[in-house]
Curated annotation (Swiss-Prot):
Location of this chain's protein in the cell: Cell membrane
InterPro entries xref list: AAE_transporter, RCK_C, RCK_C_sf, Transpt_YidE_put, YidE_YbjL
Keywords (A to Z) from UniProt: Cell membrane, Membrane, Repeat, Transmembrane, Transmembrane helix, Transport
UniProt key word Lipid biosynthesis: no
UniProt name for this protein: Putative transport protein KPN78578_40470
The organism of origin for this protein: Klebsiella pneumoniae subsp. pneumoniae (strain ATCC 700721 / MGH 78578)
Main location group: membrane
Pfam families, sorted: Asp-Al_Ex (PF06826), TrkA_C (PF02080)
Record PROSITE patterns: RCK_C (PS51202)
Topology versus the membrane: Multi-pass membrane protein
Length: 553
C-alpha cells in the first residue's frame, strides 16, 4: 500500500474510533466530536509501536484544511446574527464572556512563570482547558512563525489532550456548583426568563387596535405617530365588514380596526396613540385575502430594499414579517433582502403568486450549495489571515492565521449575505456536514501526532501536572465569573449556563445546559450571543501569549 493510501486509511480508522468514543455518554454527557482526538491518540500509539510511516506533508495539509473548513462554516452560520449580538442587548453577556477569556489568559501567564512550563506545553494546556480547537491551531501556527521546531510544536497537541477532558467536566461542575451555592430552582428561573423575554430578543407580536383618537381621523397611515417608522407594520385594515391591505397613503377613519405587527414595547406605545386593543378577529379566512410565507431565492432581488420592490403599489400586497436565519424581524421598508429570507405576504391569492414569482420562492434552491462563494470566501480568509500585523517591541508579527482569517471573513460575508449573483447562504445540513468533516480531520491529525508519546508522558512524564494546570485554567475563570454574574448582575441561571458554555465554545456543555430545562431556550440564546466574539478572542489569545512569552524569554 502506498504511503498516501496508508495515511488516508489510518485517518479513516481514527475517525471511526473517535466518533464511537464521542457517542459514549455517561449520565447524558460525552466527549462528542472531541472523542476524535482520543481516537487519534489511541491509534497513534499503536501506529508508533508498529513503526508505520505516514505521510507528514499530507497530514499537515489535512490538519490545516480541516481547521479552515471548521472555522469558515462557523462564521457563515453565525455571521447574520454576530453584529446584532454586539449591540446593547448582548453587551452584558459579552462583557462577562470576555472577562472569562481574560482571566484564563492571566492564569495561564501566571502558571507559565511560576512553574516554568515550556511555551508549547502551556499553550496546549490553555487550548485544552478552554476546549477550543481553533485556539490550538492558532497557537501552533504562531509558534512555527517564531521558528520553534516542528517536533516541539507538536507537544501542544499532547498537552491539549491532557487538559481537554477536565475542560468539559469543569464547565459542567461550575454550573452545578453555582446552582448548589445559590440554591437555584431551575423551573422558577425558566418562568422568569419567559416573563422577561419581551425585552431585547423578543419575538414579534401582533395586536388589533381600534382607531379612537379623533386627531387621527382622515390621516394617512404613514403620518400616524408610531406607524411612520420601521418598527411597526400595519398589514390589515378592517372598515365595517371590509378587510383590506392598507398602503402607506391609506386614510384611516375613526372606528377602523388596524392589525399591527411589531415588538411588544413598540405595539404598546402605538396603542397609547391610536386607541384600545380589541379582540375582534382580522383573520383572512372567509375573505378574498390570504397570508403566505415566501422564500427569497431570485438573485435579481438580492440586496434590494423592501421599499424598492413596490409590492403594495404594483400588487396590493403587504410584507408583514421577515424571518432571517430563524430570527423574526419587522419587515421595515429599509431592510435589504438576502438569499433565504422568508417573507410573510398579505394580499389576494393571485397577487401573492405574482410577488412569489418575482422573489423566487424556489424551495429546492435552499438545498443547493453555491460552491464558488465557498472557495472565494476561504481564499479571501486565508489571505486575510496571512496579513502580518507588526506591533513595536514584539519579536514576530501577529496574524489572524488560518483559524482567524477565514472566521473573520466568513462573519463579514455571512453578514453581507450576497454580492450580485453570489450569495453566501449555506443550507444548515451542508454547513454542518462541512463543519463536522473539518473538525474531524483536524482532531484526527492532532491525535495521531500526539499518540506516540502520550502514554509515556502520562505515566512517566509531566502528564499529571499538566492536567492539574489545566484544572486551574478551567475552574478559576468560570467559578469567578459565574459567582459574580449571579451575585452582582442577578443573571438568570439558564442564561448564565449558556453564557458559560459559550465562553468556552463547548457544544457538549450547551447540550447539558439545554437539558436543565427542556422547553426553555435561554441557554441556547445566550450561547449564540457570546459565541462569535469569544471564538475570535480564543483564536487571538494564544497568539498574544506566545508572542509575549517569547519576547520575554
Amino acid at each position: 500500500m502506498s504511503e498516501i493510501a496508508l495515511t488516508v486509511s489510518v485517518l479513516a480508522l481514527v475517525a471511526v474510533v473517535g466518533l464511537w468514543i464521542g457517542n459514549v455518554k455517561i449520565r447524558g454527557v460525552g466527549f462528542g466530536i472531541g472523542g476524535v482526538l482520543f481516537g487519534g491518540i489511541i491509534v497513534g500509539h499503536f501506529v508508533d509501536q508498529a513503526g508505520v510511516a505516514l505521510s507528514s506533508p499530507m497530514l499537515h495539509f489535512i490538519q490545516e484544511f480541516g481547521l479552515i473548513l471548521f472555522v469558515y462554516t462557523i462564521g457563515i452560520q453565525v455571521g447574520p446574527g454576530f453584529f446584532a449580538s454586539l449591540r446593547v442587548s448582548g453587551l452584558r453577556l459579552n462583557l462577562f464572556a470576555i472577562l472569562i477569556v481574560i482571566l484564563g489568559g492571566l492564569v495561564t501567564a501566571v502558571l507559565h512563570k511560576l512553574f516554568n512550563i515550556p511555551l508549547p506545553v502551556v499553550l496546549g494546556i490553555f487550548s485544552g482547558a478552554v476546549t477550543n480547537t481553533p485556539a490550538l491551531g492558532a497557537g501552533q501556527q504562531i509558534l512555527r512563525d517564531l521558528g520553534v521546531p516542528f517536533e516541539v510544536v507538536d507537544q501542544m497537541g499532547m498537552s491539549y489532550a491532557m487538559a481537554y477532558p477536565f475542560g468539559i467536566c469543569g464547565i459542567l461542575l461550575t454550573m452545578w456548583l453555582v446552582r448548589l451555592f445559590f440554591r437555584i430552582n431551575v423551573e422558577k428561573e425558566a418562568q422568569r426568563f419567559e416573563e422577561s423575554s419581551g425585552n431585547g430578543h423578543a419575538h414579534l407580536h401582533t395586536i388589533n387596535v381600534r382607531v379612537e383618537n379623533p386627531n387621527l381621523n382622515q390621516m394617512a397611515i404613514q403620518d400616524v405617530p408610531m406607524l411612520n417608522n420601521d418598527n411597526i407594520v400595519c398589514s390589515r385594515l378592517k372598515r365595517g365588514e371590509l378587510l383590506m391591505v392598507p398602503a402607506p397613503g391609506t386614510l384611516i377613519q375613526a372606528g377602523d380596526l388596524l392589525h399591527l405587527v411589531g415588538r411588544p414595547e413598540d405595539l404598546h406605545n402605538a396603542q397609547l396613540v391610536i386607541g384600545q386593543e380589541v379582540a375582534t378577529s382580522l383573520s383572512t379566512r372567509g375573505t378574498d385575502l390570504k397570508v403566505e410565507r415566501v422564500v427569497v431565492t431570485n438573485e435579481k432581488v438580492l440586496g434590494k430594499k423592501i421599499r424598492d420592490l413596490h409590492v403594495k403599489q404594483r400588487y396590493d400586497v403587504v410584507i408583514s414579517r421577515l424571518n432571517r436565519a430563524g430570527v423574526e424581524l419587522v419587515a421595515s421598508s429599509s431592510a435589504s433582502l438576502q438569499f433565504g429570507d422568508i417573507l410573510n405576504l398579505v394580499g389576494r391569492p393571485e397577487a401573492i403568486d405574482a410577488v412569489a414569482a418575482e422573489l423566487g420562492n424556489a424551495q429546492q434552491k435552499l438545498q443547493q450549495v453555491q460552491m464558488l462563494p465557498v472557495f472565494i470566501g476561504i481564499g479571501l480568509g486565508v489571505l486575510l489571515g496571512s496579513i502580518p500585523l507588526f506591533i513595536p517591541g514584539f519579536p514576530a508579527a501577529l496574524k489572524l492565521g488560518l483559524a482567524g482569517g477565514p472566521l473573520i471573513m466568513a462573519l463579514i460575508l455571512g453578514r453581507i449575505g450576497s454580492i450580485g449573483k453570489l450569495y453566501w447562504f449555506m443550507p444548515p445540513s451542508a454547513n454542518l456536514a462541512l463543519r463536522e468533516l473539518g473538525i474531524v480531520l483536524f482532531l484526527a491529525v492532532v491525535g495521531l501526532k500526539s499518540g506516540g508519546d502520550f502514554v509515556a508522558t502520562l505515566t512517566q512524564g509531566d502528564g499529571l501536572s499538566w492536567i492539574a494546570y489545566g484544572i486551574f485554567i478551567t475552574a478559576i475563570p468560570l467559578l469567578t465569573v459565574g459567582v459574580l454574574a449571579r451575585m452582582l448582575a442577578k443573571m438568570n441561571y439558564l442564561t448564565l449556563c449558556g453564557m458559560l458554555a459559550g465562553s468556552m465554545t463547548d457544544p457538549p456543555a450547551l447540550a447539558f445546559a439545554n437539558n436543565l430545562h427542556a422547553t426553555s431556550g435561554a441557554a441556547a440564546l445566550s450561547y449564540a450571543t457570546v459565541y462569535p466574539l469569544v471564538m475570535f478572542l480564543r483564536i487571538i489569545t494564544p497568539q498574544l501569549l506566545a508572542v509575549l512569552f517569547w519576547g520575554l524569554s
